[in-house]
């Protein structure tokens, strides 16, 4: 695994290995012959999805798991593909837990891009005025 050079994408100066590259490596690497990736959705409705990806060896021993949560209303991709996005993220995390395609971070490129976008577009929250001390605070000297 150490000798393999993964294709990466640059996001804000950091290199990230996309899930498709991790999956291609996992499927092509002879040491993972007869291993499985299985996914399940403990939560799946019209608004959100939670996916669990499990990687098992040929004896069906669980080697790694990964979880993801996506909300249908979040972002352009999720409006039509939140289930697929959720499953891909969970699989990427499970492969990352095995050390496949991990250098600096286990977040997928999409997760990093989404996080940056959300941070940049968060509404500004006004600071609340300091609350007046209530009678109990005054009684104990706060």
Range-by-range predicted roles:
Residues 1-142:
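Polyanion-binding surfaces on beta-sheet-dominated domains and ring/shell assemblies
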């Amino acid at each position: 695994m150490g000798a393999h050079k993964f294709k990466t994408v640059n996001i804000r100066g950091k290199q990230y290995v996309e899930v498709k590259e991790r999956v291609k490596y996992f499927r092509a690497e002879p040491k993972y012959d007869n291993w499985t990736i299985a996914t399940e959705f403990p939560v799946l409705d019209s608004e959100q999805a939670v996916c669990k990806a499990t990687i098992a060896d040929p004896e069906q021993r669980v080697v790694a798991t990964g979880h993801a949560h996506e909300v249908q209303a979040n972002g352009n991709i999720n409006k039509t593909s939140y289930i697929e996005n959720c499953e891909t993220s969970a699989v990427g995390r499970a492969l990352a837990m095995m050390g496949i395609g991990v250098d600096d971070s286990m977040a997928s490129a999409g997760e990093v891009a989404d996080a940056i976008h959300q941070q940049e577009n968060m509404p500004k929250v006004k600071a609340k005025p300091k609350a007046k001390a209530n009678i109990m605070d005054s009684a104990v000297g706060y």
